[in-house]
Curated annotation (Swiss-Prot):
Family matches, as PANTHER family: ATP SYNTHASE DELTA CHAIN
Biological role stated in the UniProt entry: F(1)F(0) ATP synthase produces ATP from ADP in the presence of a proton or sodium gradient. F-type ATPases consist of two structural domains, F(1) containing the extramembraneous catalytic core and F(0) containing the membrane proton channel, linked together by a central stalk and a peripheral stalk. During catalysis, ATP synthesis in the catalytic domain of F(1) is coupled via a rotary mechanism of the central stalk subunits to proton translocation. This protein is part of the stalk that links CF(0) to CF(1). It either transmits conformational changes from CF(0) to CF(1) or is implicated in proton conduction.
Subcellular localization(s) per the UniProt record: Cellular thylakoid membrane
Keywords of this entry: ATP synthesis, CF(1), Hydrogen ion transport, Ion transport, Membrane, Thylakoid, Transport
InterPro entries in alphabetical order: ATP_synth_OSCP/delta_N_sf, ATPase_OSCP/dsu
Name of the protein this chain belongs to: ATP synthase subunit delta
Gene3D superfamilies referenced in this protein's UniProt entry, alphabetically: N-terminal domain of the delta subunit of the F1F0-ATP synthase (1.10.520.20)
Entry membrane topology: Peripheral membrane protein
Subunit and interaction comment: F-type ATPases have 2 components, F(1) - the catalytic core - and F(0) - the membrane proton channel. F(1) has five subunits: alpha(3), beta(3), gamma(1), delta(1), epsilon(1). CF(0) has four main subunits: a(1), b(1), b'(1) and c(10-14). The alpha and beta chains form an alternating ring which encloses part of the gamma chain. F(1) is attached to F(0) by a central stalk formed by the gamma and epsilon chains, while a peripheral stalk is formed by the delta, b and b' chains.
NCBIfam families assigned to the protein according to its UniProt record, in alphabetical order: ATP_synt_delta
First-listed, main subcellular location of the protein, grouped into a coarse class: membrane
Family: Belongs to the ATPase delta chain family.
A GO molecular-function annotation: proton-transporting ATP synthase activity, rotational mechanism
Amino acid sequence: MPLLNSLATPYAEALLQVTEARGESETVADQCKQLLAIWNDSEDFRDAMVSPVLEPDAKKQALKALVGEDVTPSVFNLLKVLADRQRLIAFDAVMLRYLELYREQQGITLAQVRSAQSLTEDQQAALSKKVQAMAGTNKVDIDLSVDPSLIGGFVVSLGSQVIDASLSGQVRRLGLALAKAS
C-alpha cells in the first residue's frame, strides 16, 4: 500500500487545498465517504473504472452520469483528472488519504467500530458518546461496519487502542484462559 499512498497523496493534498480555498472541505469529506461506499459496494463499477480497455472519455461520461450532479465541481474535476491519467485504480486510496488529511487538519479522531449487526440510531448515538469520552474530544468520526463473525457485540478501534466487547472476543479470551489453566 505504500506505493499507492505515494500515488494518492499528491491528489489528496491538491483536493484538500482546493476545497479549503472554496470552503467546502467538510462537504467534500462527506462526498468522499459516499463515493467510497459506491466504490466498495459495486464491483462492476469498480472493474469498469480500472479497466485499461475502457477509454478515459467513456469513464468520464460514466462518472458524470453516476455522480456528476451529486458532487462538488472540485471532486468531479479530480475524478476527471484521475480518469485522464489512468489513475482511477488509486481512487479509493485518494479518497481515504483525503479523509486522513482532512481529519488531521481538523483535529478529528477516527474511531472504527465493527458490530455484529447494524446498530439502531439510539445505539449509534450512545456509542458515539462513549467513543467521544474515550477519545477525550467531541471531534470524532465514527466508521461503522457490520462484521457477523463477531457473533454479538462490537469492537472499537481508536488509534492504537482496541476495545473488544464482542462475543467472539469473549470466547477467544475464555479459550486462552482455559489453555493457560491446563
